[in-house]
Amino acid sequence: MKLQVLPLSQEAFCAYGDVIETQKRDFFHINNGLVERYHDLALVEILEQDRTLISINRAQPANLPLTIHELERHPLGTQAFIPMKGEVFVVVVALGDDKPDLSTLRAFITNGEQGVNYHRNVWHHPLFAWQRVTDFLTIDRGGSDNCDVESIPEQELCFA
């Protein structure tokens, strides 16, 4: 099956999570007017009193043609990925309770100035880089027992 990759926007992505970006976002000045603070861009949610972790994940580029065959979700916390050097990357997401609902399966490509924050329980493809090795600032939950993985029928990503 083929899955069309769409440009990432907050409107298209809102059911799956938050788009972390400054474009079209409100800000206020701090530090004597030298800094624009784009405040509260994503809801970080961590359950069961676990720690919130800030990490760097170094992702390798995926092989082409790009096909996916599994999704994962994290029931106990949100998960945010922000490329550290402005790289474009691709995310694949779906809704669903016990298993991914393939009728909600979507793929998005960022513009190089966006990160994503997956809501708790949103099915998504494991992180990968798009065209080159990419370092992602990652914000998620510490602890164990927070990753469900499900196989899905193979999908080939198609770029317009």
From Swiss-Prot:
<protein>
    <recommendedName>
        <fullName>Ureidoglycolate lyase</fullName>
        <ecNumber>4.3.2.3</ecNumber>
    </recommendedName>
</protein>
<dbReference type="InterPro" id="IPR011051">
    <property type="entry name" value="RmlC_Cupin_sf"/>
</dbReference>
<keyword id="KW-0659">Purine metabolism</keyword>
<dbReference type="InterPro" id="IPR047233">
    <property type="entry name" value="UAH_cupin"/>
</dbReference>
<dbReference type="GO" id="GO:0004848">
    <property type="term" value="F:ureidoglycolate hydrolase activity"/>
</dbReference>
<comment type="subunit">
    <text>Homodimer.</text>
</comment>
<dbReference type="Pfam" id="PF04115">
    <property type="entry name" value="Ureidogly_lyase"/>
</dbReference>
<dbReference type="GO" id="GO:0006145">
    <property type="term" value="P:purine nucleobase catabolic process"/>
</dbReference>
<comment type="pathway">
    <text>Nitrogen metabolism; (S)-allantoin degradation.</text>
</comment>
<comment type="function">
    <text>Catalyzes the catabolism of the allantoin degradation intermediate (S)-ureidoglycolate, generating urea and glyoxylate. Involved in the anaerobic utilization of allantoin as sole nitrogen source. Reinforces the induction of genes involved in the degradation of allantoin and glyoxylate by producing glyoxylate.</text>
</comment>
<dbReference type="GO" id="GO:0050385">
    <property type="term" value="F:ureidoglycolate lyase activity"/>
</dbReference>
<dbReference type="GO" id="GO:0000256">
    <property type="term" value="P:allantoin catabolic process"/>
</dbReference>
<keyword id="KW-0456">Lyase</keyword>
<dbReference type="InterPro" id="IPR024060">
    <property type="entry name" value="Ureidoglycolate_lyase_dom_sf"/>
</dbReference>
<dbReference type="InterPro" id="IPR007247">
    <property type="entry name" value="Ureidogly_lyase"/>
</dbReference>
<comment type="similarity">
    <text>Belongs to the ureidoglycolate lyase family.</text>
</comment>
<dbReference type="InterPro" id="IPR023525">
    <property type="entry name" value="Ureidogly_lyase_bac"/>
</dbReference>
